[in-house]
């Protein structure tokens, strides 16, 4: 029985550790691995689209999206993250294939036992320069909308309709990975959680969100300055808490 268990672990080890994983990852703690990082690159693939969705009684379950590349959301996130982690790490500018990362961003699941983490593979093949100690990768997260298996991701507005009221929530669902720049193991990963204010308002969304008082029907393109400011402010409030929880500050 013991021999079978040992053989099973030896068979599964390459899949559990990833294609380039090593026994080192088994014995080093997350803090040890983060502590060894000096140079770091920041990759962001969140702000290509903004989605409008509805949920609740008698609502149309279809959604619509607008392109928001001109808002510079990814650039704003990269700048803020660089400032927050730059006190601890040497932030090195990197370039990457935006289309490649957006193709995977917001899809689920992120990890396959047999193929490893898809974003770790993207870092290995689509990012320059290679050879940094680690890369911070920020992408869209998917969260449940209600109990029917429906999901939403990234940036957007959700209009909720109940028997008593109708209200709209602005959301910014994202996740952060820290990927080893040599082994391409995922050192740490986290999906951003709700802000304290979200919990008090009982928005029931598993990520950063807040009530939105502006007009939703009037938004037809990316020219809405108020919505632009609101989403950047929501992300700016969430990032410090998320990075702190990941021990990156």
Task: Tell me what each language-model feature is.
Residues 7-18:
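Bacterial N-terminal signal peptides
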Residues 109, 162-165:
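Extracellular/periplasm-exposed beta-strand and loop segments of Gram-negative cell-envelope proteins
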Residues 149:
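Active-site microenvironments of hydrolase-like enzyme catalytic domains
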Residues 17-86:
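General N-terminal leader/first-domain-start detector
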Residues 52-71, 156-161, 207-221:
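A solvent-exposed, charged loop/short amphipathic helix patch at secondary-structure junctions
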Residues 55-146, 173-193:
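N-terminal segment of the mature soluble domain
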Residues 22-50, 142, 153, 164-249:
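C-terminal/domain-edge helix-coil "capping" segments
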Residues 1-4:
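Positively charged n-region of N-terminal signal peptides that target proteins for export
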């Amino acid at each position: 029985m013991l021999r079978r268990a040992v053989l099973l672990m030896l068979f599964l080890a390459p899949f559990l550790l990833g294609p380039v994983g090593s026994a080192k990852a088994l014995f080093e703690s997350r803090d040890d691995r983060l502590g060894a990082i000096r140079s770091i690159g920041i990759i962001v693939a969140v702000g290509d689209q903004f989605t409008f969705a509805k949920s609740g009684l008698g609502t149309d379950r279809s959604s619509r999206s607008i392109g928001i590349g001109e808002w510079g959301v990814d650039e704003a996130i990269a700048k803020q993250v660089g400032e927050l982690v730059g006190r601890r790490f040497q932030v090195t500018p990197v370039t990457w294939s935006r289309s490649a990362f957006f193709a995977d961003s917001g899809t689920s699941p992120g990890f396959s036992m047999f193929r490893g983490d898809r974003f770790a593979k993207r870092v290995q093949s689509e990012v320059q320069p290679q050879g940094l100690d680690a890369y911070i990768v920020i992408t869209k997260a998917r969260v449940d909308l209600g109990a029917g298996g429906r999901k939403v991701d990234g940036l957007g507005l959700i209009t909720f309709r109940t028997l008593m009221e109708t209200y709209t929530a602005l959301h910014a669902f994202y996740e952060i990975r820290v990927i080893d720049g040599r082994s391409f193991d995922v050192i740490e990963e986290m999906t951003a959680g709700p802000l304290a204010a979200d919990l008090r308002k009982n928005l029931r969304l598993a990520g950063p969100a807040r009530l939105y008082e502006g007009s939703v029907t009037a938004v037809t393109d990316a020219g809405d300055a108020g919505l632009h400011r609101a989403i950047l402010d929501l992300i700016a409030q969430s990032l410090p808490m998320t990075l702190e929880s990941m021990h990156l500050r």
